[in-house]
């Protein structure tokens, strides 16, 4: 078995057999956690000097929750049969579409 690159999103197989409603629930759960951390981050930024420990901690928590959302999406794609190569192709297509739209 190949070594897992822990610096890239890896699909979690625990929910591989989940039905659509369960996937949606998991995605909503993780998205709600990201929303809560985003609100917390905004509040802390408004009330603290930039670069303080509180701001940096809140930023890290938000980043981790956003990464959890990415991981759920990668896991769901994996469960749908999109391995890393197929997910890479999807990313390329979406990036090309976004480039044409002038998003970057």
Positions of the model-derived regions?
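Flexible "arm" and connector segments at domain edges
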Residues: 1-104
